[in-house]
């Protein structure tokens, strides 16, 4: 720890800066998508768990939705099960889905729960199948080349999209001071399980809960402009325009769309933040500068003094 970090005056200054944010967001729900480097580096893992506990202690209700793609890939490799991808999505047959459930609903989920509990919180691990929280349907993937007269439907197995989020279980746990930790596995009316993109699940959970914030932890600093600077304080109209003119493209586009749709669906603000920064969630919520890209149509969300 640096000498500055030990300076009591600096500690008081930080707490003073955080106070209006704590007052404003107390009693609100914040949905956090946890993944990337923040999930694999020991220092970041510990800081994330402490962030969730601190949020709960100051009256904010965090809800965690996590990924686990690398961990799924590792176990599939150990079991000599080939991984195939179509459009960046894992082709998930019945055998692969069993592994997905074991990893997401078991290994990864309970590891996060344990970390939060060891940091002084009360976390409960769930999948979307518990309490039928996440009703899913199979995702239809279309492929078409210029030579084709019509697109073909590609069957990628047990990969789904969200049809409905039931919030009663999440709300009950949050009201009893628990921190829900949700694996992105959904179920359809026939009881079939589906692996769903964790960003999309987090966005839909945030919409269903009427959350104050959706926070997507990533391995980048945020949405960058042509000069390499992080853009923030963006409206949905601005983001739509940047998607339309090609300013936003490539790997960031799916996350931006997820964040955008959440705000359009009633979430006060979405944040794409740098999960490589220790305590990124607290820095984004409780400081004036933040550590990522904020998307909101609520002018006062940029600063509590506005």
UniProtKB/Swiss-Prot annotation:
Q: Which residues bind substrate?
A: 68-69, 90, 195
Q: Which GO terms describe its molecular function?
A: acetylglutamate kinase activity; ATP binding
Please report a single Pfam family linked to this protein.
Answer: AA_kinase
Q: What is its EC number?
A: 2.7.2.8
GO (cellular component) term, any one? cytoplasm
Keyword Phosphoprotein attached: no
Subcellular location(s) per record: Cytoplasm
Catalytic activity reported? N-acetyl-L-glutamate + ATP = N-acetyl-L-glutamyl 5-phosphate + ADP
Pathway involvement? Amino-acid biosynthesis; L-arginine biosynthesis; N(2)-acetyl-L-ornithine from L-glutamate: step 2/4
Site-annotated residues for Transition state stabilizer: 33, 255
Q: What class of enzyme is it?
A: transferase
**What's the family?**
Belongs to the acetylglutamate kinase family. ArgB subfamily.
Annotated PANTHER family: N-ACETYLGLUTAMATE SYNTHASE, N-ACETYLGLUTAMATE SYNTHASE, MITOCHONDRIAL
**Which NCBIfam families does this UniProt record tie to the protein?**
argB
Q: What does this protein do?
A: Catalyzes the ATP-dependent phosphorylation of N-acetyl-L-glutamate.
What is the official name of this protein in its record?
A: Acetylglutamate kinase
Record organism:
Chromohalobacter salexigens (strain ATCC BAA-138 / DSM 3043 / CIP 106854 / NCIMB 13768 / 1H11)
Gene responsible for this protein? argB
